[in-house]
Curated annotation (Swiss-Prot):
TM region(s), chain numbering: none
EC number, as in UniProt: 2.7.1.148
Organism of origin: Staphylococcus haemolyticus (strain JCSC1435)
Gene3D superfamilies: 3.30.230.10, GHMP kinase, C-terminal domain (3.30.70.890)
Protein name per UniProt: Putative 4-diphosphocytidyl-2-C-methyl-D-erythritol kinase
């Protein structure tokens, strides 16, 4: 049996530049990981089936599951003659903007690579993974990075300054497609990705917090005002910086001191069912 860990990601920045001819948006973003993980195990089957074993009411176990699709892609690409059972122990909240599904898919690709002794590089897996999800290339590596294009153009950065992270997911669902559809690409405001990168390179925690930015945030907030309330609550309770991750709805707050982070955690715990106190991994 093979084991893999799938950490959640957060966006430190997210900018949308223009809509491409293929229908996707050209993006530029900086992402990193936190120590909130799904855990996966992989075991060969003789019947060539893909079986996803997951005890979660809101997560499918068929082709709608990204881990299933990742396994299917690996089996078809590398002509595997055995199946696989994938067991997922899930802690990352679903439809949260934390790339939980993409992290599971990336872990599945790494796991099958090891299980079947395919000896494929992470670069090869990343190039393959973009076929089923824009966050999968980043999740293959699980390293702080600038991601451009659809997410497949990756440039690694050093780890960001250490910090506590409070993650809060409000009790609502959000459609990434609806958020991108509502985005005004003629809006002149763009995210300063370079400022955030400079803060990471120089280890400047204060500048990092000041440079957190997500072009999708005001769009999601206009659809769901609860997101803005959570962010404001975090900042009022002492977060050094706060931002919505991805297309939402999860908001995170950064703090250098554990006592500070616990205060933020307690402040938002009453209004959200899913609140986590974790650390930056990078």
């Amino acid at each position: 049996m093979i084991y893999e860990t799938a950490p959640a990601k957060i966006n430190l920045t997210l900018d949308t530049l223009f809509k491409r001819d293929d229908g996707y948006h050209e993006i530029a973003m900086i992402m990193t990981t936190v120590d909130l993980n799904d855990r996966l195990s992989f075991q060969k089957r003789k019947d060539k089936k893909i079986v996803v074993d997951i005890e979660h009411n809101y997560v499918p176990n068929d082709h709608k599951n990204l881990a299933y699709r990742a396994a299917q892609l690996m089996m078809e690409t590398y002509d595997l003659n055995e199946g696989v059972t994938i067991t997922i122990d899930k802690d990352i909240p679903v439809s949260a903007g934390l790339a939980g599904g993409s992290a599971d898919a990336a872990a599945t690709m790494r796991g099958i690579n090891r299980l079947f002794n395919l000896d494929k590089s992470l670069h090869e897996l990343s190039d393959l993974g973009i076929q089923i999800g824009t966050d999968i290339p980043f999740c293959i590596y699980n390293r702080t990075a600038v991601c451009k294009g659809r997410g497949e153009k990756i440039r690694f950065l050093k780890k960001p300054p250490s910090a506590w992270v409070v993650l809060a997911k409000p009790n609502l669902g959000i459609s990434s497609a609806d958020v991108f559809k509502a985005l005004d690409l003629d809006d002149a405001h763009h995210v300063d990705t370079e400022m955030c990168e400079k803060a990471i390179v120089e280890g400047d925690y204060k500048q990092l917090c000041e440079s957190l930015s997500n072009r999708l945030e005001p769009v999601s907030m206009s659809m769901h005002p609860e997101i803005k309330k959570i962010k404001n609550n975090m900042l009022q309770c002492g977060a050094d910086g706060a931002l919505m991750s991805g297309s939402g709805p999860t908001v995170y707050g950064l703090a250098q001191k554990e006592s500070q982070a616990k205060k933020i955690y307690n402040a938002v715990n009453g209004c959200c069912n899913e609140v986590y106190l974790v650390r930056l991994l990078g």
